[in-house]
Amino acid sequence: MALLTDDFDAVVASRRAVRAFLPTPISRKLISEIIDIARLAPSNSNTQPWSIHVLTGEPKQALSALLGIAHNDPSADPLAHLPDDLARKYRERQEKWGELFYGLHQIDKCDDAGRARVSGLNFDFFGAPVGLIFTIDSNLKKYSWLDYGLFLQTLMLTARSRGLSTCPQVSFARFQSLIKDFLHLDDSQEIVCGMSLGYADENATVNSLRMPREMAQGFTHFMGFDR
């Protein structure tokens, strides 16, 4: 089987976190096709630790409404998805992301209300017709989360190869109890993240944003090669 390297490279290069979608419906058949390819991702000892909840229509709207209320509750705990003592190079990248993202929305660094309003769009899945919630057994160790990352990337690239776009969203992990209650899950499950899935609105300004990436030589270390 011949592999089309240029085509694969184009799929990888065109994948980005899309934050504005068209309402165009996505068929269950197409979503199932994407998941059926993503399931081939590798995992430690073939444990395959992933579980997906696929929402559209009324269920998606109902979950979004509940999450919107929770997000706007000032007593809700923030999501600590990065350590307070973040190393300088990671902090600088995070700050650059905030500068570019919120700058595009013309929101000042000190405008907490504006930032909360924009981040709240996460919970409407950025207008995408399909929302995905990913869960994992809570007693699994960090290596299974590595497996999960491989699965998520495979799913996103498979979706992209079919003309769809995605946005992986760790923000959903902030509301573990709410989402687990909605999905009728017990405490043996943990929310990994959410994901928006649909066709990108190419006319939306937010989708023009491209984040900088460090060049490969900045983090790659070769040993034993001639040059």
From Swiss-Prot:
In which residues is FMN bound?
Answer: 15-19, 213
Which key words are in the record? Flavoprotein, FMN, NAD, Oxidoreductase
Q: How is the cofactor bound?
A: Binds 1 FMN per subunit.
Name the Gene3D superfamilies for this protein: NADH Oxidase (3.40.109.10)
Q: Which GO terms describe its molecular function?
A: oxidoreductase activity
Q: Which residues form a coiled coil?
A: none
Q: Please state what class of enzyme this protein is.
A: oxidoreductase
Top-level division of the source organism's lineage = Bacteria
* Requisite cofactors: FMN
Which PANTHER family does the record cross-reference, listed alphabetically? Answer: NAD(P)H NITROREDUCTASE YDGI-RELATED, NITROREDUCTASE
Descriptive protein name: 4-nitrobenzoate reductase
Q: Which organism is it from?
A: Pseudomonas putida (Arthrobacter siderocapsulatus)
What is the primary gene name for this protein? pnbA
